[in-house]
Curated annotation (Swiss-Prot):
Homopentamer. Belongs to the MscL family. This is Large-conductance mechanosensitive channel. It comes from the Bacteria. The chain crosses the membrane at residues 14-34, 38-58, 67-87. The gene is mscL. Coiled coil: none annotated. It is a multi-pass membrane protein.
Length: 132
């Protein structure tokens, strides 16, 4: 049972997925900070001091903080656009590497060369028998 767990836990895909989740969480924090600390204040200056997070409505002590919701949507859109651009660049780089691999014709192995020579000799023998 322990060996099965080790095979599962240390498979390349599982480890890659775990690394992706950790990096994704850190990337999300970076983009959230970018939106909260840089983009939203700049947008506020352009639009005359608009701060989404303070927007709310309510009655008495109850309040619906729809500004936080708008801010979260804004964060999501920026994160989604950033990930889209990252994946697009990554796919472009990956496809170039695959094209380079396809262009390279591998050298035939010794066995392939030997088999080709044997095939050619057999063809010569068969063609000389047909002529005789």
């Amino acid at each position: 049972m322990w060996n099965e767990f080790k095979k599962f836990a240390f498979k390349g895909n599982v480890v890659d997925l775990a690394v992706g989740v950790v990096i994704g969480a850190a990337f999300g924090k970076i983009v959230s900070s970018l939106v909260k600390d840089i983009i939203t204040p700049l947008l506020g200056m352009v639009l005359g001091g608009v701060d989404f997070t303070s927007l709310h409505f309510g009655y008495g002590k109850s309040a619906v903080m729809y500004g936080n919701f708008i801010q979260t949507i804004f964060d999501f859109l920026i994160i989604a656009a950033s990930i889209f651009m990252f994946v697009k660049v990554f796919n472009k780089l990956t496809s170039k590497k695959e094209e380079e691999k396809e262009e390279e014709i591998p050298e035939p192995t010794k066995e392939e060369v030997l088999l080709s020579e044997i095939r050619d000799l057999l063809k010569q023998q068969n063609s000389s028998k047909d002529r005789a």
